[in-house]
């Protein structure tokens, strides 16, 4: 696992965006051989999306031959709702870049057959071979996507019941009213994430410090879903300074020295 320790949330977003752009451009995608990118929602990736849009407008990257798969979606929330992940992605990213509509894949939380929707999502991912890079965030309790504590580390795309803590955390997007936050969501599984060629998780804020410590220094444990990254051959964790508060000094020193060339100048 790589740990990229930076100072601010803005630096995390810019580093992540640059990494994505470098991967896409090195891949040299075509219509017949697209780059497959996994994407998250929420507050954490907003600076990364802003930076990606800016780099696209500057001519540094095209998303014309990029196929995207989003991590999750609420169940029962109309896709036109301002807090649906469909709306979030179009508002913050898709509407500002040159990605073709047919290359965008979002789970349908209003599908008449939820099980079939999840199965077809997995099949579509497999039809492209694999996701080349999956970007994600992490919850205070260590969940990635909506794989809440005690999720199977071999799980696939499915419906999940959201914990009360997750709904409280997400209520900031629903006028602070937890009762407006859906109780269920569709989410890619931990196994789905681990199948990606590379996984990049962004960690911001002191409230995520315990989750980061569990990911980097703890044991692989289904109660801390983020610890699954230890099983991945190419995992990258990009974090700001407040989120590192629970890490041992020697751990942080080790990664600062290891990644010195990759973080200088930020």
From Swiss-Prot:
Q: InterPro entries in the record, alphabetically?
A: Glc/Gal-6P_isomerase, Glucosamine6P_isomerase, Glucosamine6P_isomerase_CS, NagB/RpiA_transferase-like
The UniProt entry, under Pfam families, shows:
Glucosamine_iso (PF01182)
On the tree of life, the source organism's domain of life is Bacteria
Q: Does the keyword Transmembrane apply?
A: no
Active site (UniProt): 72 (proton acceptor), 141 (for ring-opening step), 143 (proton acceptor), 148 (for ring-opening step)
Q: Name one GO cellular component term.
A: cytoplasm
**SS bond partners:** none
How activity is controlled: the entry says: Allosterically activated by N-acetylglucosamine 6-phosphate (GlcNAc6P).
Instruction: Name the catalysed reactions.
Output: alpha-D-glucosamine 6-phosphate + H2O = beta-D-fructose 6-phosphate + NH4(+)
Q: Is Hydrolase found in the keyword set? A: yes
GO BP of this protein: carbohydrate metabolic process; glucosamine catabolic process; N-acetylglucosamine catabolic process; N-acetylneuraminate catabolic process
Q: Where is this site: Part of the allosteric site?
A: 151, 158, 160-161, 254
* EC top class, as a word: hydrolase
Q: What is its EC number?
A: 3.5.99.6
Query: According to its UniProt record, in which pathway does this protein act?
Result: Amino-sugar metabolism; N-acetylneuraminate degradation; D-fructose 6-phosphate from N-acetylneuraminate: step 5/5
GO molecular function annotation: glucosamine-6-phosphate deaminase activity; identical protein binding
Keyword annotations of the record: Allosteric enzyme, Carbohydrate metabolism, Hydrolase
What does the sequence similarity comment in the record state about its family?
Belongs to the glucosamine/galactosamine-6-phosphate isomerase family. NagB subfamily.
Q: How does it assemble?
A: Homohexamer.
Q: What NCBIfam families would the database entry show?
A: nagB (TIGR00502), PRK00443.1-5 (NF001685)
Explain the purpose of this protein: Catalyzes the reversible isomerization-deamination of glucosamine 6-phosphate (GlcN6P) to form fructose 6-phosphate (Fru6P) and ammonium ion.
Q: What is this protein called?
A: Glucosamine-6-phosphate deaminase
What organism is recorded for this protein? Salmonella typhimurium (strain LT2 / SGSC1412 / ATCC 700720)
Designated gene of the protein? nagB
């Amino acid at each position: 696992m790589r740990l990229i320790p930076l100072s601010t949330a803005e630096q995390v977003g810019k580093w992540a965006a640059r990494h994505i752009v470098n991967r896409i451009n090195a891949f040299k995608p075509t219509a017949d051989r697209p780059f497959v990118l996994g994407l998250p929602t929420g507050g954490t990736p907003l600076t990364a999306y802003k930076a990606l849009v800016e780099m696209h407008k500057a001519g540094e990257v095209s998303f014309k031959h990029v196929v995207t798969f989003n991590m999750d979606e609420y169940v029962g929330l109309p896709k036109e709702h301002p807090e649906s992940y469909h709306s979030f992605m179009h508002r913050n990213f898709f509407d500002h870049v040159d990605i073709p509509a047919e290359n965008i894949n979002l789970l349908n939380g209003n599908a008449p057959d939820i099980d079939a929707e999840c199965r077809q999502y997995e099949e579509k991912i497999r039809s492209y071979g694999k996701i080349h890079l999956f970007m994600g965030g992490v919850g205070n309790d260590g969940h990635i996507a909506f794989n809440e504590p005690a999720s199977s580390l071999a799980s696939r795309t499915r419906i999940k019941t959201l914990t009360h803590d997750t709904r409280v955390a997400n209520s900031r997007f629903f006028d602070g009213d937890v009762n407006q936050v859906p109780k269920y969501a569709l989410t890619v599984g931990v196994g789905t994430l681990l199948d990606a060629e590379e996984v990049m998780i962004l960690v911001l804020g002191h409230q995520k410090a315990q989750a980061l410590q569990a990911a980097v220094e703890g044991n692989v444990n289904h109660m801390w879903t983020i610890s699954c990254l230890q099983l991945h051959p190419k995992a990258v964790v990009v974090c700001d300074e407040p989120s590192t508060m629970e890490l041992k000094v020697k751990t942080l020193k080790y990664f600062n020295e290891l990644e010195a060339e990759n973080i200088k100048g930020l």
